[in-house]
């Protein structure tokens, strides 16, 4: 009991600060939990599976009896235990650090002991050197190994060593193009190009005349077109307005209708004063 109280008290002082409960309050809480049957032994308080039942029982007791002292103490203890668990500090390690016994935890091995600054720098330099060498080895291009044959000779000249056939073959120009029989129209292309190269620059080369077949689509350029047909004579213009309108028979009583004088239609032509009224002459 005393060992568990010391461990919990030190944890509360570490994670709760000034609000940490006293050892007397922690002991009273543990005695109550054992009395209620929530803990078989004080060390069961370290297991997270017992935290929820303890919280529920103390909350119900505070609601029924109105005593919240144990619930407040349990809240502080629970916060310290959760913080210690988050930092991966187990109960065995806490007991070993406090020298309370109850658990055997081996001290940290030599690999966990912190090395001096000089040794860390040396180790870091060695690691950097190794990584640099490995990176350079990966980035270096792989050498292509040429297969070496023993007792072989060149199939061109038959010599075993010192043959330059491969170099001569590589530097030789390609063979000239030979026209095939499938395209007879391309047979003389090479000769025409050679002839064209012989002519000096600026000189006009003779143009090949187009080959005409038997079909002609239109007249030749030299042929003259027939003259256009003469236009028809211009139509005669309409005669001017007649000066007088002939009388039309069939008036009232068989009398002919009067005719209008030109001055009625053109009053300004004669310069008379009666511009708006024309002279009407009746015929008997």
UniProtKB/Swiss-Prot annotation:
**Pro residues bias (residue ranges):** 225-236
Motif range (PPXY motif): 174-177
Q: Name one GO cellular component term.
A: virion component
One Gene Ontology term of the biological-process aspect is: viral budding via host ESCRT complex
Annotated site residue numbers, Cleavage: 155-156, 166-167, 179-180, 231-232
From start to end residue, where is composition biased (Basic and acidic residues)?
A: 128-141, 191-212
Check the record and name the InterPro entries matching this protein: Gag_M, Matrix_HIV/RSV_N, Retrovr_matrix
GO MF annotation, one: structural constituent of virion
User: Gene3D superfamilies attached here?
Assistant: Immunodeficiency lentiviruses, gag gene matrix protein p17
Spell out where the chain crosses the membrane.
none
Q: Name one Pfam family in it.
A: Retro_M
Q: Which UniProt keywords apply?
A: Host-virus interaction, Oncogene, Viral budding, Viral budding via the host ESCRT complexes, Viral matrix protein, Viral release from host cell, Virion
- Ranges for the region named Disordered are 128-149, 188-236, 249-284
Segments of skewed composition (Low complexity) = 249-265
Post-translational modification here is noted as: Gag polyprotein: Specific enzymatic cleavages in vivo yield mature proteins.
Additional comment: Gag polyprotein: This protein is synthesized as a Gag-vYes polyprotein.
Annotated domain remarks: Late-budding domains (L domains) are short sequence motifs essential for viral particle budding. They recruit proteins of the host ESCRT machinery (Endosomal Sorting Complex Required for Transport) or ESCRT-associated proteins. Gag contains one L domain: a PPXY motif which potentially interacts with the WW domain 3 of NEDD4 E3 ubiquitin ligase (Potential).
- Name the chain's protein: Gag-yes polyprotein
